[in-house]
Amino acid sequence: MRALIQRVSHASVTVDGVVVGQTGPGLLVLVCAMAGDGEAQADQLAAKIARLRIFKDEAGKMNRSVLDIGGAALVVSQFTLAADTRSGNRPGFSSAAPPAEGERIYEYFAAQLAAQGVPVETGRFGADMKVELLNDGPVTIWMDI
């Protein structure tokens, strides 16, 4: 699985003019299931993100997790994270999981992150979404599992 994790002051996702998910201080997690991914990868990614220490402690060091700060996560599917740009000028996405499997793994991942104790809201898989965020730091982490 592939994820782009952003520490945010707030974030929201809108579909057809309606906010379908939002968070205050916490994480925006853009996530892509890759071909061959399954529940094991989703479990590992959820556990890692829940404990990822990218929030400042009292000394100003990145030493606290989203769980430690009582934050939440907005999880948004984004198959374009699978882009292959090595050849030509048009990205290829053949390394992404097929849509039905990608949706299943995406939903499973969001549920597993919530099971770790992180309040989770989500976007809508496959929809044309508008994502707004205020990146805090900025802190942006690329993660492959």
Swiss-Prot record:
Annotated domain remarks: A Gly-cisPro motif from one monomer fits into the active site of the other monomer to allow specific chiral rejection of L-amino acids.
UniProt organism field: Ruegeria pomeroyi (strain ATCC 700808 / DSM 15171 / DSS-3)
GO biological process: D-amino acid catabolic process
Source taxon at top rank: Bacteria
Reactions that this protein is recorded to catalyse: glycyl-tRNA(Ala) + H2O = tRNA(Ala) + glycine + H(+); a D-aminoacyl-tRNA + H2O = a tRNA + a D-alpha-amino acid + H(+)
GO terms for cellular component: cytoplasm
InterPro entries: Daa-tRNA_deacyls_DTD, DTD-like_sf
Family: Belongs to the DTD family.
Role of this protein: An aminoacyl-tRNA editing enzyme that deacylates mischarged D-aminoacyl-tRNAs. Also deacylates mischarged glycyl-tRNA(Ala), protecting cells against glycine mischarging by AlaRS. Acts via tRNA-based rather than protein-based catalysis; rejects L-amino acids rather than detecting D-amino acids in the active site. By recycling D-aminoacyl-tRNA to D-amino acids and free tRNA molecules, this enzyme counteracts the toxicity associated with the formation of D-aminoacyl-tRNA entities in vivo and helps enforce protein L-homochirality.
Keyword RNA-binding: yes
Gene field: dtd
Disulphide-bonded residues: none
Name of the protein in its database record: D-aminoacyl-tRNA deacylase
Subcellular location(s) of the protein: Cytoplasm
Lineage: Bacteria, Pseudomonadati, Pseudomonadota, Alphaproteobacteria, Rhodobacterales
Major subcellular location class: cytoplasm
Keyword entries, A-Z: Cytoplasm, Hydrolase, RNA-binding, tRNA-binding
Record keyword tRNA-binding present: yes
EC numbers on record: 3.1.1.96
One GO MF term attached to the UniProt entry: Ser(Gly)-tRNA(Ala) hydrolase activity
Subunit comment: Homodimer.
SUPFAM superfamilies: DTD-like
Class of the enzyme per the UniProt entry, highest EC level: hydrolase
Pfam families the record matches: Tyr_Deacylase (PF02580)
Motif annotated as Gly-cisPro motif, important for rejection of L-amino acids, chain positions: 137-138
